[in-house]
Amino acid sequence: MRITRERHVYSLGVSEPVATVTAPCSLTVETCDCFNGPVTEAGQPKARLNFSHVNPATGPIVVEGAEPGDVLRVHIRAIRPEKTGALMTAPGAGALPDRVKGDTRICPIADGHFTFMGVERPLNPMIGGIGVAPACESVPCGTPGDDGAHLGTIGLRWGATRRLRVVVPGPLL
């Protein structure tokens, strides 16, 4: 089964499912980048982004028969990045807020490498978040929590297995 990136949400827990699966199964899930695509040019101002629509998650997918107390195991078999990636900094944000100026860079990606400011480096693609419906009504996909959601860890890459604790029936992965 293939689920395309056009079928995405910005909150876990409240959306109509796009598919139903029975575990164990194998899926191909296309994902959006964290900005859902609008960052396409160097120097693009942050002000052009709608920050209520960042960190989209493809789905949700009902896992039939999964009940509270179960653990879903999601194994990432492959990640195939796009041909470019975007980096964006915002003034006053991050670990060095007084030193950071707003900027946007577009990095070409080819043959397992990306190029940033003329330097080619190995690419280590990762998935920002994989989550399940939370016990509360909903959680924005950009919020880290027990449900998985936005993990932002380089450990969530090809070959990794993510275990998610089910807290609601048919947990909307």
Place the predicted regions along the sequence by residue.
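Loop/turn positions that initiate beta-strands
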Residues: 24, 66-69, 159
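Short, compositionally biased
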Residues: 40-54, 58, 85-98
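Residue-level "contact hotspot" at macromolecular interaction interfaces
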Residues: 20-21, 65, 155
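Short, structured beta-strand/loop micro-motifs enriched in basic residues and often containing a Trp
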Residues: 2-13, 50-58, 139-147
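Intrinsically disordered, low-complexity linker/loop segments enriched in Gly/Pro
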Residues: 78-158, 163
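Short, Lys/Arg- and Gly-enriched loop/turn segments at beta-strand edges
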Residues: 34-45, 79-89, 170-173
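A generic structural signal for residues embedded in beta-strands
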Residues: 29, 71-74, 164
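N-terminal, Lys/Arg-enriched amphipathic/low-complexity engagement segments
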Residues: 1-49
